[in-house]
Every structure is written in C-alpha cells, then in structure tokens.
C-alpha cells in the first residue's frame, strides 16, 4: 500500500509506503531480473553478432540471443547462477516506511522471489562455514537518501563467476590515466573466460577504498553503452573498450573480437595521496530491474 498526505497546510507532502508493498515488489523484481534480459543487452548481442568475425563467436552470440528469448517466454532463469541479490535503494526524504523494518522487508522479498520463482539458492550465511541459507538471503543493500517522496528499488542479481574476477588497486597519483588503463586491461586479461564473456566492465576511479568499489558496481547499472557525461571519461571508456576487445578473448573465451559489450566508468573526488581504481566485471547476463514506489 502506498498513500500520500500533507502534514500541514502548505507543508511537506509525506508518502507512506507499507513494507507489504515492498516485499511484493522485491519478490517480483527477483524473478523479472532473472527471466527478462534488458533490451539494451539484447541489442548489444545482436550488434556484436553482426560484427563478430569468429564463426565460433557468432555461434555463441546466437545461442545467447536464443537463450534470452527462451528464458523470457518460458519464465525460467537465463543462467543457472541466479545471483546474489544486490539491492540499490533511493529513499526519498519525504517517505515514511510503515509495517516493519525496511531491510527485513527487502530480505523477505528476496526470500519469496527466489522460492516462488524456483531460483537457485546461492548464498551461505557464514563465509567460512559455508552453510547455505536456503533462501538466497541475506541480500546486499545499498541505500541513498534523495530529495522527494518516492522509493526507487533497483535489484541486480550478481553471479559469482564474474564477481570473483573483479579487482581493486590503490594506485599512486603519478600512475595517472595510463596506470588506470593498464590495471583495467590486465584485470580483464587475467579474468580470461572465467566471467563468461562477452562482459560488461564497470570501473570506479577515486574516492576511498570502499567508495571506489561502489562506483564500479554502480557503473554496471548504466544503460549499456551510455557514455559518461564527462568528455575525458567518455574518451577513456572508448579507449578501454577498444583495447579490451583487442585481447581476442571472445565470447565464452573461445576467441573473437567480442570480449566486452561495454565499458562504463564512474568517478569521484580522491585524496591527494591516492588514486583508487576498481574493476567490477559483469557476465553477459547483465541483469537489473527497477521499480519506483
């Protein structure tokens, strides 16, 4: 349930959102993200198919297109790894949550979505004891407070294979843009076939250790191929895209010119002594769906 009211005449408009609605929407997003690949990714597959010179690579890209179509039509996961539920919340400062704890509601939505959608349960409760929680919780939840009276929920299931190939390095400021490029390209090269290419490469530059990693993760949420608003960063994205595709890793690591579908770079201010760089790799199943309440 979602309802709005003014707290006083001419005052701030407060929207109340019940956790029952949040649970329902998160459960839906879990399934939708795993069943329906974004149109931007499908178009990138088709473009890559037309440009790929390797017959093996073309065959794999055709299979990926067909696989995505079957998943959508039959409402089954496009990949057996249905991912860690990574949730991004943009919580309007004029929103009131009622009916329980917001984070508990998110986790209950994930629990229901993965259970009712027969999605693989991939999460262990303790990283060393390795006992599966059996319901794909806990989710990873990132919250940003923003102006307004809406709650935006973005759900991005993240597979283990591509996440394992991600990396972060604290460069020296003197390393500059060439140092950044070298690290990104080396990370992709070392990953080879493991993240199930063609990949999407999210890069974070600046901030602190944890902010840099977050930037790289957020870069993966951008519509595929959408350029940075900063001309120098857009140029860097283009250069990295070209260099990565020269590596010849190709679709599923079997050779070809399509190693990456896109490179997205996000930046933030940095300390005078630091140049943090993070690379978060996404497999070809670039899944994320959103809703605004």
Regions found by a protein language model. Give the residues of each.
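Non-transmembrane, aqueous-exposed alpha-helical and coiled segments at domain scale
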Residues: 10-293
